Amino acid sequence: MSWKTICWEAILLGFLFSCTGSDKDPMDRKYQIDYDYLKSNFQQPDRTYGVNCWWWWLNGNVTKEAITKDLEAMKSRNFQGAMIFDAGGHNQRGNKDIPAGPLFGSEEWTELFVFALDEAKRLGLEIGFNIQSGWNLGGPCVTPQYAAKQLTYSERKVTGGKTLRLQLAEPDIYKGFYKDIVVLAFPSNKENKTNEPVSNLDLKLGFHELGGSAPDCRFLLENNTRGREKKTDKTIYLIDIARIVDLTTQMDEKGLFSWDAPEGDWNIMRIGYTCTRSEVSTSSRDWQGNVLDYMDRNAFDYYWNTIVEPILQAAGEKHVGSTLKFMETDSWECGGMNWTDAFADEFRSYCGYDLKLYLPLIAGHVVDNIDTSNAFLADFRKTIAHLVATNHYACFAEHAHQHNMGIQPESAGPHAGPLDGMKNYGFSDIVMSEFWSPSPHRPRPQDRFFIKQASSAAHIYGKKIVGAESFTTIGPHWNDELWHDQKSAFDHEICAGLNRVYFHTFTCSPAEQGIPGQEYFAGTHVNPRVTWWSKSAPFIDYMHRVQMLAQEGTFVADILYYYGDHVPNVYPFKHSDMPGAMFGFDYDVTDENILMKLGVKDGDIVVPGGRKYKVLVLPDHRILSLPVLKKLEMLVKEGASVLGPKPQKAVSLFGGEKGAAEFKKLVDLLWGTTIGTTGQNQYGKGFVSWGITAKEYLLSRNQPVDFAVEGNDSKTDFDYIHYVIDDAHVYFVSNQTTERQKIDACFRVSGLQPELWNALTGEIREAGAFTQKDEKTVVPLTLEPYGSMFVVFHKKIDRNKQGAKAGNDPDYEILQTLDGAWTVNFDPEWGGPSSVVFPELIDWTRHSDKRIKYFSGTAVYNKKFTVNFEKNPANRYYLQLENVKDVGIASVCINGKDKGIVWTKPFRVDITDGLKEGENDVVVEVTNSWFNRVAGDEMAVSPTKYTQTNIVLGNDFRGNAVSEITLEPSGLLGPVTIQVAVEQK
């Protein structure tokens, strides 16, 4: 460091300290202000912490009236903003077509777009937009020159010992585009035939993406039969690379080839590249076209200048960078691509060697041996991922930043395209992922939750917002049960690091499309046309409160997990727990790009932004790159703790034979030459350990768990996330079961008063029950089914102080059951009877009256009852509805006093100040979803059709017709009880 730099840093530090007052500790003052800010914004969150949405403009079919109605509805629910997403998808999976509106980017479409910006500005909402119609970048403007490319070849066998003059056949060509790369020859004698081909070759070459979401891709590093094998009778050769001959100069531009061929049998390969068959997916009508070449910066520049720049120019300075803040592209769902014009040069620059002699692999031949071939293929895929990151996502960010805008592409899966997700995320301004609600299409958690990789990138790169396309499903439609489906999924992903929901979907639907109107074929529909919109505020407010604290917090983790340097590389959901952290510790995920920048301070592993971890955990597949191994040697030497199995081989051909020798030397240096199943080796100031989990390792180093539920070590019953906000510790604790749970929650905090912050209500109270011991605080919590609570530690107390109460939440005793008859009023405008008496509470779908059986909307339950117990003014009394279907949302009024809306189990409201001695009148409004009414209309159960939509409920999620539409249980099912709160003992 130069003397000039030292002086400048001293001046800067002096200036910073001079900005603080000397009369009191500036940290105390800042801390007090921030804490008050947290409390006020928790109770009534600012709009900036609100939810956002994928605002679908399906087939371009929107109107100014519908735009205004939607934006005003968003404002009424305190939305932060909306992401305009022009797309098709309305007619997928057996659903019906809708009219076509203006084409994306056309003059008419852009006029509607600018109108939406004007309205959003008027309402104080932020707008983003997806820069194409459909899922992946491309469209009718993308000519073959700029389209995605793939390798292609032709091959023929010849006999040498003479001069050959041949017309080499053109390889398969798509979309009229082809360019040659190289012509190669290699011996093809029976002696070098092999029966051991490279497995999963099309996947390893990037011709296809892996199926499913967040699959384990590590099998691509080795030779095994997992994945999708293509059966072939083709003869496969094992080729000595030294005998492969580059004959490119022997072929003219017309494919005429001449060669004085040596004796023996030879294979001649003409290798080039053409367009892939990929087309833009799920676009509006007339936006079909080629997928863009994601590896070519010129292709992105062309698309930007042709499509995006004119839209921004139309939006103008009054919107761009202010109302119009972010741009998006959707997740990779465009198949494979494995070549671009400059690929050979880029490969040489990135990997350090020439790739051409390895290209017989595309025909299935083995070059040198299986290990060498697989190592080359790993380098090949890493180069694809590198080019996608630097020539597509980095280029996207550069263009956006020139307009004072940010980007938020879903650039890391969960589909396993040729991506390094963590590297891509480094170019994002908002880190985006997705998660799904439970449904027949995706019932398993590992198929629905993908936030961990995105949140790790945000933590490491210092990005504030971790967003997600949220609550995606593929059918059935409108039958969401908020407490069971949406809240459980939201809380699960909050614990993985989510801090902003983007509702998928919020569809713009013109009035002429009726009610519930046009909808996307997938997603949880949230918009002003759903039956329960008028009661949606508490559900959305809950998410706002949770997001506020999550966005303000700094994540706490002890473990950094390196998930390998292979491509594709998509980390699965948090509970896959590859480092072995759970339950009790948390972790971040990192890739090679970040690992190469790690440092060590006081034994902690430090990322460039300053975040610290206690241990670095390696993947268990025993394959690493030489650069990573060199970096590990440096980290351990300086004092880092590294945990993982001894590597067996290098993932790459980088460094050649010299590199392979260095790799073995470093492995033996770090792990030792002879090791058992478990053990530890000291090197320099640090240690390398193996054979134990990260949790076991940290406990062995006397690092206490960050969070625990005493007596329950389940990884699935409970979850948590820990943030620090200034000097406050903020824990979000989630019950991930359908049962009420009483737990003793143990936190790695002491000397601070625990507070309970209830995101359902905004209530903040000090915990009266807690114990401090061994630098930990144990707080009794009662969590309702899929319930949650923030536990906040802020105010200093004596470390020996203990809470005075036995519990922090009451139990509830039933005093009276409101059984017997209820009068129920349905809305005749939606086909229901104006008034009917239920002798007892019943599921509407079991009623003999079809007007009730197929009803959708709000029904008003009325009941008069006489209190049969003596009220005690010291008690709190509650009305518990217990079971509300199908959305699970209701409002309660007693004796004319509104007691609010309930949407979570057990649907309990405080009626203390409304309940009176003698006769009482209770009114319960219950709202179900559109599902049953749409089903009834589809089956023509009534001469009157009440609904209009493109969605067909008579198909399953695959689009296949079902024999019968099963209706969704609906209504107030009870039992309805009056309960009294009693102190826990």
Residue ranges and their predicted role:
Residues 268-273, 789-796, 863, 921-928:
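Short, hydrophobic/aromatic-enriched beta-strand segments in well-ordered soluble domains
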